């Protein structure tokens, strides 16, 4: 079991559901103060009601002004920030590259990559003044193996890795660490939806679609969202104090994606 030696002050983007909610729950279970955001007010409020002590803001991570307000609101009640989890992301269009609109490309990059820059930019001074901080960026296993038809998504998530490595070098002298987690096939509504869409496209049942995906994962396994939460807690703990600049797969070793 990983114990946090002190009450961590944590900001998690897109924390209202899915992986973000699982990460929030993991930190709450360790006694952390947690501030989340979500673009959907109904989703956000439902999560806040579900988890005692959780606070949050309605935020479009692709909007720099929204992000400035998010960080300001979180810092006002927490008094600082020890951990930033950049989890917000969208799947973007599913299409051949030549058919992707400029609008869809720009929106995907804006949320998935620019949003992380906005968040890091707005907490950097606070962490520098503290001489400590942990930043965790959520990328994807697709960043390693590519994914035809999803070029904006993959490009944005590869960009996340470059940002992660650069932040680790640039801010390491100030005691700030930065790592990326690369999840695989997540066993939640979104992950199952991906398989359902694949099944419809191929005119096969869900079980056959599942076999098609799992055969390219060495451990033949789904990933539970709570596992990503547990890894994030580990990286933010004293046990992870010398881990920085790393891209860590939580994917059962994805060999290929279809």
For each feature predicted by the language model, list its residue ranges.
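Active-site helix of classical SDR
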Residues: 120, 156, 164
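Conserved glycine-rich cofactor-binding loop
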Residues: 16-18
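Residue(s) in the substrate-gating loop at a strand-loop-helix junction
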Residues: 140
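Substrate-binding pocket helix/loop in short-chain dehydrogenase/reductase
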Residues: 95-97, 101-109, 135, 213
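Short C-terminal tail/terminal secondary-structure segment
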Residues: 4, 91-94, 145, 221, ...
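Short, small/polar-rich loop/turn modules that mediate ligand/substrate recognition or access, typified
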Residues: 172, 177, 243-245
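C-terminal helical subdomain
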Residues: 180, 188, 204-239, 243, ...
